[in-house]
Every structure is written in C-alpha cells, then in structure tokens.
Amino acid sequence: MKRLLGECRDRGLCGGGKVSRPPSRLKTDHGAYSVSLPFQRAMNIILKRIRQRLSPQSFPDTAEELAKSDLFAGWWYYSVELLPGLITKGQYPDSFPMLPRILLRNCDLRGTTCLDLGSMEGLMPVVMCRQGAKAVLATDAIDHCRQKMAALRYYYKASFEFQQVGLMYDLSNKLRNPGRGSFDIINVSGLLYHVFSPLMVLAGLRPLLKRNGLMIVSTNVVVDDSFTMQFNNAGSLQEEVNTFWYLSVRALDYVLRYLKLAPIDCLYISHRDIKSSVRYVTDVESGYLSVVCRAKDDPIASREDTWMLKSAQHSWEYAGLVDWDSCNQQAVTHVPYSATIEKNLLRDDTGTVDLLRALSRRTIHQAERSSDAHVLRLADIS
C-alpha cells in the first residue's frame, strides 16, 4: 500500500505529500456530497492496482480475440506462438540462431534448479521448464515484460518465478535465497556487453552456481589473438546505447578459467552471417560466442601461466568481489552434458576447450529450424 501511495504522490495525485483529505462537505446541486478530485483519482488508482495484484490475469482463448488484443500487437523481443498459428513479431529474423538454446539441449535438466539472466518475455525459462527443470528463476533489470511473461506461463503451462534485480551487480546477494538454494545451471547470455563491468557480473554470479554445475556464458566477442576488451566508442561496434564492451575471445577464455569455470563446449556465429536491420558488421572481425562451462574448485591456469594462481591467492579484488567461501560450501551437482567436442580443440595442459581454436569448427551460419532460432512455438520441447 505504501508503494502505491508513493506512486500516486509521484503522479501529483496527492497533495502536500499526503493523500488529500476530503473537504468538510461540498454540496452539489442535488444536495449530495463529494470529495476532492485528486483524492478520488488516488483512491481509484490504489483500488485498481490492488485488484490487479489480487486477481489472476486473464488472456484471450480464441484466435480472434488474441489477434485484436494489445498483448499480441505490442512490442516483443522474441517471436512467440501464443495460440496455434498466431506468432508475435519478435526482433530477430528466423534465420538468426539462438546459440545458448541449442547448447542447453545437451544439458540434462531433469530435477535441476535453473537461473536465467535477462529473461525478457521468458523463452529460456519456458524451455528450461519443458526440459524437466524442477525450479526456474527468471530475472531482468526491470519488470518490463510482466504481462508477456505471464502470458507465456499461461499459454505454455509453465511454472517459473521472476525476480527484478536492477543493475546486474552483486547478484549473489540479490538472488541468494535459503529456501531456494543455489543453482545447477545458470544461463548468462546476451548480457556481458550491456554492462560497465563484465567481470563484476560474473563475480556476482559465481557463488550462486553449485560445485560441478554448468554455466552458459554468451556474448559478443572480437576475434583476434589479443587479451583485451574493446569499447564501443561512438557506437563503433553497435549503435545500441546500452552496449559497452566486446571481449576478445582469448580474454573471455582466460576470465572464465580464472573464475574456476572450465569451457567444455561452444558455438559461434560471425556477425557477417547475421541478417538483421541492426548493424553488427564493422571493420573489426566480431561475432557472438556461446560457451558451456563446468564449475571447478580451482582456477584453471595454462602450463606457462604462473600469474593466475598467484593472483587467485593474493588479489584483494579476487578475494573480496567473489564469495569463494560460499562457492566452496555449495553442494556438488551432477548435471550430465551429453555433447562431446573434438579432442584437437582441447588444450593439452588444461583439458578445456581452446575457444579461439574452436571457432572455425563450432560455427553455425544460420538456424536450420525455428526451434534453433529466437522463436518459441507451442510444440517446442527445447
């Protein structure tokens, strides 16, 4: 109630910082009495919000009703079939493969607890539910897809929670819940290039993953031999205003191993293969890389790297920004991953996938079917 009153005050519907008291008695021409208009508006908003929150949402059950609805006609991130043959218009062409979705099929989700970051309308949470997850938590910075997410729950008969997290930092504290516990699988895809500090986001997520759990990390990358992050100065990489950094492939590989995440599989699409109205191609060779990682108990340094382990032992940032005590106390999970990758793509010293070497062999040029794309259909099971 306090929050609703605050909203009314912010909208200028309540006077003097408080709900307006009705004047003593204002006679009308009919001898009746009325209250002040701002007070009436405030109370109407409060009552409407209370009814909305106490009453389950209803959605069109016929194609005719749905086709005429604001729900169907509104802006959608994903293309979603809500009723047979009625698919919302998403932001991506059907040829654009959704790499983390494809990789998720190799994970045995039965009985698992899953976390999805930046869920939008909830395509990945629905897929996780349909693959047998016991519990799924969807998240986003703001609650901007509440109605559409509720629609997916309704039409797909999916049961998952949602939590608004604000800026994607300090997630271990924001999402820690004794009743829910930690996660067997975490999907953090399409996020790291949207934040000021990709390492801070991963540092906040790492304590939420069970020992031996799986994390899918997907982000835009620069393809070269450097260990760098390239800044989106003047929109040179993308014109989108919340895009800041592209990690180099080698930098991403290193950061994951530094945070005790072993790359075990990956898929890649070059930005040159993406047919979209959004400009992805620049004079920098770049693309979108999705990596499946297995949580380990120690940093994974290459044979010649003496710095990584020293840094992990003595760095204040490493010790202070990642709750390693929580990581070490996590239960051990045994989520199977069914895909195998060619041995020549593995580093001989770490046993992990060499991401730069793997790009050419693990490239997808386009989606072969809608279930590989940013499209969700009622018949999809993954």
Predicted regions and their residues:
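Conserved alpha-helix/loop element of class I SAM-dependent methyltransferases that forms part
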Residues: 91-110
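Conserved class I S-adenosyl-L-methionine
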Residues: 112-120, 217-236
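Glycine-rich SAM-binding Motif I of class I
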Residues: 122-126
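Class I SAM-dependent methyltransferase SAM/SAH-binding core
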Residues: 127, 131-169
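A conserved beta-strand element that flanks and buttresses the S-adenosyl-L-methionine
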Residues: 187
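A short glycine-rich, Lys/Arg-flanked "PGG" loop and its adjoining helix->strand segment in the class I
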Residues: 199-214
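Acceptor-substrate binding/catalytic loop of class I
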Residues: 235-250
